[in-house]
């Protein structure tokens, strides 16, 4: 069963709550999942796994399909960093350099896909 689609209004409301500060955990979770959903729509595929624990993960970017074990191309970050880079408040390269994004694999650079336009 595919994950429940987050409607645009719900996603934007969650992003506004996070931007206002002190968002409750459910709003942060919705904001993260909404942005992951937008990324998956923008770059469909299965060659890179984008992880934002504990809220979600998606596989994106066309290329070799991964089926078992740890994918060869993985990006992992925390919720605050993901929201910042996905919305353009922080640059991908700055977050990687600071160690807030861990990207491994030849296809794991998502900078060309960001920021998203929620």
Residue ranges and their predicted role:
Residues 1-118:
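Feature captures hydrophobic
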